[in-house]
Amino acid sequence: MASFNESILPETLRSIDSATFTGSYQALGTPLVYAARAVKWTNNSNKDVTLSWNGTVDHEFIPAGSSFIFDVAANKEGTNQCYIAAGTQFYVKGSAGTGSFYMSSYYA
């Protein structure tokens, strides 16, 4: 039987109400506390959302009613792990709408 030394744990769910969207980038909650192995963005609003890792450049487009999972540690073993750095702040922009936009993050 395999030996498992690590557990995956969630950070606090981050969200922003799409009614507050202005068309400019806004911080999506707080920066990551831990280096993330996987992140899921869920657009539960009725508006398309653009995601940025720096608040300036467009990095991902997440249509209304959809989600996007970024599993940077998938199929990685040993010391060659890839993570999203602790302290990373994500930003979103879109037109004001109804519903919320969420981010779930997971660390080991």
Please state what every model-predicted region is.
Residues 27-31, 58-59:
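Local beta-strand/beta-hairpin segments that build beta-sheet-rich folds
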Residues 32-38:
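Extended extracellular/luminal ectodomain segments enriched in beta-structured repeat modules
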Residues 44-61, 104:
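Short, surface-exposed beta-strand/strand-loop-strand elements in extracellular ectodomains
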Residues 1-25, 29, 93-108:
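C-terminal interaction-tip segments
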Residues 39-45, 92-94:
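Asparagine-centered strand-capping/turn motif at beta-strand->loop junctions
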Residues 29-31, 65-87:
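Beta-sandwich interaction modules
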Residues 37, 47-49, 99-101:
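Short beta-strand/loop motifs in extracellular/secreted proteins, especially
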